[in-house]
Amino acid sequence: MKLLLLLLTVTLLLAQVTPVMKCWGKSGRCRTTCKESEVYYILCKTEAKCCVDPKYVPVKPKLTDTNTSLESTSAV
């Protein structure tokens, strides 16, 4: 009976593991080091990085040449 109680206690303690902090709209995980397949762009509240799968990171917008748009505006 004591063995059963000990087993139950250990099982309950293992089930109460601290949940992983999520970030980036719940698509990322706060870790000290990211996996090889992950990238990070922001930091979590602690000194951890927000590790995200690259498919969830938005693509950087392509910048337009501002000089050409200014020249065409001044010619009008």
From Swiss-Prot:
Key words, A-Z: Antibiotic, Antimicrobial, Defensin, Disulfide bond, Secreted, Signal
Pfam assignment, any one: Defensin_beta_2
GO-annotated cellular components: extracellular region
Disulfide bonds: C23-C50, C30-C44, C34-C51
Gene Ontology BP term (one): defense response to Gram-negative bacterium
Protein name as it appears in the record: Beta-defensin 121
Tissue: Abundant expression in the male reproductive tract only.
Native organism: Homo sapiens
Signal peptide start and end residues: 1-15
Family the entry assigns: Belongs to the beta-defensin family.
Gene name in the database record: DEFB121
Role, per record: Has antibacterial activity.
Keyword Secreted applies: yes
Location relative to the cell: Secreted
